[in-house]
């Protein structure tokens, strides 16, 4: 089990969104793929406890999903990266049928807020070369991507498919000679938000490229799997 203690500043509606999304995905994907909420004796999913300073904290317990984080799985074969894309594409298709009143609109990690975040914090980058690079790509995003944003699909997105949140397991557990791996789960829904659906893929691509000798090729494998499951039209 995983026992989660939320920040005292956390909004209840955000936790409700996380659990509603998990319930939705659990129904669409089947039992055992996603963490499930455990209820208290009073049948509550979320309850409150007092901290050492009498501050009230929301707590909950989730089932534990077995798997190895992608960051600890080597190598990242083309098959595995494509499987990651397929998994995310299936999730994006599922989220087309999911809505919630909470959208985490103000979340700093919401892709909607990217340009504002860059404008607000770029001055704090002390390395002038890196600062110029961020300004360049921030400007390019606004001039090239900005005009087409109104035409892009929007949905709830997990928004954090980094290599610590993607869990991997054997694709053929009953075959001891097989080295094939597959994605079995995506954990940590803390950054879930309503934004551009393509952001789901963008986050995964960024992390898939890290430390790769051929980063563009690694990203392409993720895109291939995603597109096969959830065709891109952007």
Task: Name these PLM-found stretches.
Residues 2:
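Glycine-rich ATP phosphate-binding loop
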Residues 5-56, 73, 78-82:
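A conserved alpha-helical element in kinase catalytic cores
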Residues 8, 67, 184, 192-194, ...:
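Activation segment
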Residues 41, 74-130, 154:
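A cross-family kinase active-site recognition segment
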Residues 99-100, 116-159, 169-181:
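An alpha-helical support segment within catalytic cores of ATP-dependent transferases
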Residues 165-200:
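Catalytic activation segment of kinase domains across protein kinase-like and atypical kinase folds
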Residues 197-231:
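Active-site activation/catalytic loop segments of kinase-like enzymes and analogous catalytic loops
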């Amino acid at each position: 089990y995983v026992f989660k203690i939320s920040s005292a500043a956390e909004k209840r509606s955000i936790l409700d969104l996380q659990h509603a999304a998990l319930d939705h995905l659990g129904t669409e994907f089947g039992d055992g793929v996603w963490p499930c909420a455990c209820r208290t004796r009073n049948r509550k999913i979320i309850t409150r406890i007092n901290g050492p300073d009498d501050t009230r904290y929301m707590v909950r317990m989730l089932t534990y999903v077995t798997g190895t984080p992608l960051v600890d799985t080597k190598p990242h074969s083309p098959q595995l990266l494509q499987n990651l894309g397929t998994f995310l594409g299936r999730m994006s298709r599922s989220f087309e049928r999911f809505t919630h009143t909470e959208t985490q609109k103000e979340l700093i990690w919401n892709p909607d807020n990217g340009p504002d975040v860059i404008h607000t914090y770029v001055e704090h980058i002390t390395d002038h070369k890196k600062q110029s690079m961020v300004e360049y790509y921030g400007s390019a995003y606004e001039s090239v991507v900005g005009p087409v944003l109104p035409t892009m699909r929007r949905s709830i997105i997990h928004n954090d498919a980094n290599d610590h949140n993607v869990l991997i397991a054997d694709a053929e557990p009953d075959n001891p000679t097989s080295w094939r791996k597959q994605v079995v789960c995506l954990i940590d829904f803390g950054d879930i938000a309503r934004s551009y659906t393509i952001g789901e893929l963008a986050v995964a691509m960024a992390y898939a490229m890290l430390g790769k000798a051929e980063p563009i090729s690694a990203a392409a494998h993720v895109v291939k799997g995603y597109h096969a499951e959830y065709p891109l039209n952007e």
